[in-house]
């Protein structure tokens, strides 16, 4: 049976550190690669990421700035922002063995190309095996060993199962799937919808409005997923409904917190507070892709318009509430 005993994690931010911890708990030999010199030094000397304070890195994890060292692992987790994934994979490609699984752990769509994460991997490293990890998971929870379930998808069922086994620990439970598109699509779409939910919270519109926004947001996710070939069961699973539910209900979500700040009257630049809210980058791309397939996404459209400065929060809310009445889907 296929197995991966060594795992490299590229990216020493909060999520990368958490996944490195998970790999170590699962009994794998883990190498954590960090590009940033200051954070790499912090990880090596103090065994703590600048982006995840209070979590001590497992002593078995090797920290490196040498990409070729990380490339020797049997499976590689790509825990870098969606918009720099292509750059990282392009640098990694000449260093890896054929069929090495490259697992995207970012939730987004590339600007300009409209490519999903596994499509970028396939283009930049054609000899690799693209895969995706997604689901309702916060770095702080995972790093501390709190119970979490995610989905890992690859087109080859055996590889997906082996990757899930490699990251399986007592508290981190990966389910495996072959619906790569469905898994990555859910993660990217929910980022935009979480901003909308945050706006509702920040505007203090109440629990009823938040429930309505989340539910109708899921309808948009389903429409978009169906148009782009996702399986219905995937949309109803961890990487779809599960991730959406989590990120539309707690300030631990960067996208939700970003939306809360927008709802309180902050500008997009002020609302970011120096942290990456991937949904802000994904929103305009998502809308372009929806138009190509004639998919109606009014909530996502409103978020994109707010971020572009084309409409105020109050005007966006009014436009959603005054849309023509229709039968529920």
Curated annotation (Swiss-Prot):
Its EC number is 1.1.1.94. The keyword Oxidoreductase applies. The active site is at residue 190. It catalyses: sn-glycerol 3-phosphate + NAD(+) = dihydroxyacetone phosphate + NADH + H(+); sn-glycerol 3-phosphate + NADP(+) = dihydroxyacetone phosphate + NADPH + H(+). It holds the Pfam family NAD_Gly3P_dh_N. One of its GO terms (molecular function) is NAD binding. GO terms for cellular component: cytosol. One of its GO terms (biological process) is phospholipid biosynthetic process. Sn-glycerol 3-phosphate binds at residues 107, 135, 137, 190, 243, 253-255. The keyword Thylakoid does not apply. Pathway: Membrane lipid metabolism; glycerophospholipid metabolism. Keywords: Cytoplasm, Lipid biosynthesis, Lipid metabolism, NAD, NADP, Nucleotide-binding, Oxidoreductase, Phospholipid biosynthesis, Phospholipid metabolism. It is found in: Cytoplasm. InterPro entries: 6-PGluconate_DH-like_C_sf (IPR008927), 6PGD_dom2 (IPR013328), G3P_DH_NAD-dep (IPR006168), G3P_DH_NAD-dep_C (IPR006109), G3P_DH_NAD-dep_N (IPR011128), NAD(P)-bd_dom_sf (IPR036291). NADPH binds at residues 15, 35, 51, 107, 139, 254, 276, 278. SUPFAM superfamilies: 6-phosphogluconate dehydrogenase C-terminal domain-like (SSF48179), NAD(P)-binding Rossmann-fold domains (SSF51735). Belongs to the NAD-dependent glycerol-3-phosphate dehydrogenase family. Catalyzes the reduction of the glycolytic intermediate dihydroxyacetone phosphate (DHAP) to sn-glycerol 3-phosphate (G3P), the key precursor for phospholipid synthesis. PANTHER family: GLYCEROL-3-PHOSPHATE DEHYDROGENASE, GLYCEROL-3-PHOSPHATE DEHYDROGENASE [NAD(+)] 2, CHLOROPLASTIC. This is Glycerol-3-phosphate dehydrogenase [NAD(P)+]. The gene is gpsA.
